[in-house]
Design a protein with these regions (language model features):
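Outer membrane beta-barrel
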Residues: 1-10, 25-148, 161-162, 166, ...
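Outer-membrane beta-barrel translocator domains and adjoining extracellular loop/strand segments
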Residues: 3-8, 70-74, 103-111, 149-157, ...
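Flexible glycine-rich, low-complexity coil/linker segments exposed to the extracellular/periplasmic environment
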Residues: 4-33, 249, 253-261, 265
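Short sequence motifs at beta-strands and strand-loop junctions characteristic
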Residues: 29-37, 72-74, 118-121, 159-162, ...
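Membrane-embedded beta-strand positions in outer-membrane beta-barrel channels/transporters
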Residues: 39-43, 79-81, 126-128, 166-168, ...
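Transmembrane beta-strands of outer-membrane beta-barrel proteins
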Residues: 56-60, 91-93, 136-140, 167, ...
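Detector for outer-membrane/organellar transmembrane beta-barrel domains
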Residues: 178-317, 321
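Outer-membrane beta-barrel "beta-signal"
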Residues: 362-376
């Protein structure tokens, strides 16, 4: 059926809701096909002379993914950063993965969505400090937003005049011959948003919204298999390509209503995924399972049954879950695979004042994807 995603469905999230025409036919129940090469990427790793007593390096990486659906096939920036590396400290300045994305532990699926909407997915301009202590890493990131932003764009974060902050702690241990690995990590993030500066009634406003997010990951790798697990809980996870966002806060104040100067309340989301893969050099089998739940808000929402009160992804969805097996074949620099995806979104016809969705009807979709990679 038709799906919610970006880049002509290449970055797939979940199936579209049922939409009946005048004859009660679901117009979204339509099988589709596509063929794209927009994930073609180019990367340059740069190494230069020492500076400030540190080793210097940098990365520039782009792809033909475009920045919007309208610019698909256009070249866009993925990573662009410089790094200063001392004995136990790194300083990274530029655009790279958000602090909630653990490069050491994410689903090894074929699809470009990397497990969304169950897995945080965002790249941000940032300043990042990495402190290493034996098997531990402590990472502090202060970030802005670019391609992965709030509902309506990055203005909400920029208007707050404060960067998004993320603190991450991880433990990674290998055995002597590095055939076994244990990785455990956790992160906590905080951001302030000012979604607008003027109301629809042309009154200045500076109402803000605070949002927190937390995540945990675990990975165990042995010679034959790799097992990974992740859990996320957060407010306004829209910029992480997950369910969530924020809504207008309910009020009975007549002046606030007359001016349209509403406050905001974040929507809460919990998500988890489990990924398993074999580690063969020529053939690998993997299985991903994911679940996400819309928990609504802790405060009453203005006109809570109206879509206009929400600035969120999946505001009328109670849950999403996915089961996705994959078969991967490897030969030299070539990798190809077939991946199945069964995703169910629970759309509700009733919503209470806290944005909690009920009277849910599951809507499912089956997706089959073939991928071909050539690495050079």
């Amino acid at each position: 059926r038709k799906t919610v995603g970006i880049r002509e469905g290449h970055f797939y999230l979940y199936p579209e809701n049922i939409k009946y025409d005048a004859d009660s036919v679901d117009v979204n129940a339509k099988t589709t096909f596509n063929f794209l090469s927009i994930q073609t990427r180019l990367r340059g790793d740069i190494y230069g002379p020492d500076a400030f007593g540190a080793k210097t390096s940098g990365v520039i990486e782009g792809e033909f993914y475009g920045t919007t659906d309208a610019s698909i096939n256009g070249f866009r920036l993925r990573h662009a950063f410089a790094k200063l590396s001392w004995e136990s400290t790194d300083l990274v300045i530029g655009q790279t993965w958000h602090g909630m994305f653990f490069e050491e532990c994410f689903p090894e699926i074929m699809a470009v969505n990397t497990g969304c909407p169950f897995q945080p997915f965002s790249r941000n301009p940032q300043i990042k400090i990495v402190q290493k202590l034996k098997d531990f890493k402590f990472i502090l990131s202060v970030m802005s937003q670019r391609d992965f932003a709030e509902w309506g764009g990055s203005d909400a974060l920029r208007n707050a005049a404060l960067p998004e902050v993320n603190l991450r702690i991880s433990y990674q241990h290998f055995n002597e011959d590095k055939t076994r690995e244990v990785f455990v990590g956790g992160s906590a993030g905080y951001k302030v948003l000012v979604p607008r500066l003027v109301t629809d009634s042309n009154y200045a406003t500076n109402n803000s919204l605070n949002a927190y997010a937390f995540s945990l990951v675990f990975k165990y790798r042995c010679p034959k298999v790799t097992f990974k697990l992740s859990g996320v809980y957060g407010e306004d996870l829209y910029s992480q390509t997950m369910l969530g966002g924020y809504a207008l806060k309910h009020t009975t104040d007549s002046l606030t209503i007359a001016r349209g100067d509403y406050s905001y309340t974040p929507l809460h989301t919990v998500a988890s995924w489990l990924d398993f893969t074999t580690n063969g050099s020529k053939f690998r089998f993997g299985l991903l399972g994911g679940f996400s739940k819309n928990l609504g808000s802790f405060q009453n929402i203005l006109n809570w049954t109206s879509e206009k009160s929400y600035f969120a992804r999946g505001w009328n969805i109670s849950y999403v879950y996915r089961i996705s097996p994959r078969f991967v074949f490897i030969s030299g620099k070539v990798k190809m695979g077939i991946e199945g995806d069964y995703t169910v979104a629970g759309y509700g016809s009733e919503i209470n004042s806290l944005g909690e969705v009920s009277n849910v009807k599951p809507v499912s979709n089956v997706r089959l994807m073939y991928s071909f990679f050539y690495f050079f």
